[in-house]
A protein has these predicted regions:
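Transmembrane beta-barrel strand/turn architecture of Gram-negative outer membrane proteins
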Residues: 1-8, 37-42, 49, 82-93, ...
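Repeated loop/turn-to-beta-strand initiation elements of outer-membrane beta-barrel proteins
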Residues: 2-6, 14, 45-51, 98-101, ...
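Flexible loop and strand-edge segments within Gram-negative outer membrane beta-barrel domains
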Residues: 3-51, 56-84
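Transmembrane beta-barrel strands of outer-membrane/channel proteins
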Residues: 6-12, 52-58, 103-109, 153-157, ...
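Outer-membrane beta-barrel translocator domains and adjoining extracellular loop/strand segments
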Residues: 8-11, 16-25, 54, 62-72, ...
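Structural signature of outer-membrane beta-barrel domains
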Residues: 11-16, 34, 46, 57-63, ...
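Outer-membrane beta-barrel signature, preferentially recognizing the C-terminal barrel domain
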Residues: 22-44, 80, 130-132, 176, ...
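Outer-membrane beta-barrel transmembrane domain signature of Gram-negative proteins
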Residues: 31-33, 44, 56, 69-152
Length: 275
């Protein structure tokens, strides 16, 4: 079967910031309009399913920073517009019992521009005008090896027009134990590209930022009891990261990449369904 659907959403709002009682602000007003639309075509069959989707998001902002008592009104107002559009496709298929293979592709284009409009003359003083593209392809494979063991592995290749290409692998094993218990072990890589704001906008901006990266190791145990009414779990994790984006804490501030970071811990959860 096939399914086609779409949606459109447009929102506009005006906002005013009066400041505090001690330090009131005058004319600190914002006019914000944002819109989003998407279109998707899905397919569902006995051994395969997938979807092709397109999206477009945009925004328009007009902001008066206002002034304090005793100061002069702003002579120019901040303006900006931004957009993000893209396409996403995936198809998942089962070739034999206990198997699931998924392949997919993502593309997105994003960016925007900002400027200050001089009230007296209408002159437009340019600020930031940046556009970026990101392409990604991925494969995910899941296989039930037998009744008590499942394997999950995947890799994603991401190319960003500013920072280049990154490989993101992940893999895990799930042990299906007696009495509705399960033990999972997983290792995965994650990363985050710096945003246009972090690289190009306002005082901390730094165009030389590198993407944040981390590797996560996780071991978890869970079980269901009392006819699945009671659920509890325990999770151990260790994360090793690099290049976390942060402010250097100086004046003027500057966004920088940190050195290595480590984080580890234990999480526990429990739930009970009464009816």
């Amino acid at each position: 079967s096939w399914k086609l659907w779409g949606d459109v959403n447009v929102t506009h709002f005006n906002a005013s910031n009066p400041g505090t009682i001690q330090v009131p602000l005058i004319d600190n007003d914002s006019r914000i309009t944002r819109g989003m639309t998407s279109l998707a075509l899905e397919n569902h069959y006995e051994k395969t399913s997938g979807a092709l989707s397109l999206f477009y998001n945009w925004g328009r902002h007009k902001i008066n920073d206002g002034y304090k008592t005793g100061e002069q009104p702003q002579t120019s107002h901040f303006n900006s517009k931004d957009k993000m559009l893209g396409i996403s496709w995936y198809q998942s298929a089962t070739f034999f019992t206990g198997n699931r293979l998924t392949v997919g592709f993502d593309y997105q284009h994003f960016g925007g521009e900002s400027w200050n409009k001089v009230l007296a003359t209408g002159e437009r003083k340019p600020g930031v005008d940046k556009q970026m593209d990101e392409f990604a392809g991925y494969v995910d494979f899941r296989q039930d090896i037998n009744s008590w063991l499942s394997l999950d592995a995947g890799v994603r290749v991401d190319h960003h027009s500013h920072v280049g290409t990154e490989w993101i692998p992940q893999g895990g094993l799930a042990f299906h134990l007696p009495k509705s218990a399960e033990l999972k072990a997983m290792v995965s890589k994650g990363y985050r590209n710096p945003t246009i704001r972090e690289m190009y906008m306002f005082a901390p901006a730094n165009p030389e930022l590198n993407p944040e990266k981390l590797v996560s190791y996780e071991l978890s145990y869970s079980q269901r009891l009392l006819e699945d009414a009671l659920y509890y779990g325990l999770n151990l994790y260790y994360i090793n990261g690099d290049n976390v984006i942060m402010s250097n804490g100086l004046t003027p501030p500057l966004n920088v990449n940190s050195g290595e970071i480590e984080n580890w811990g234990i999480e526990a959860n429990i739930g009970y369904r009464f009816n």
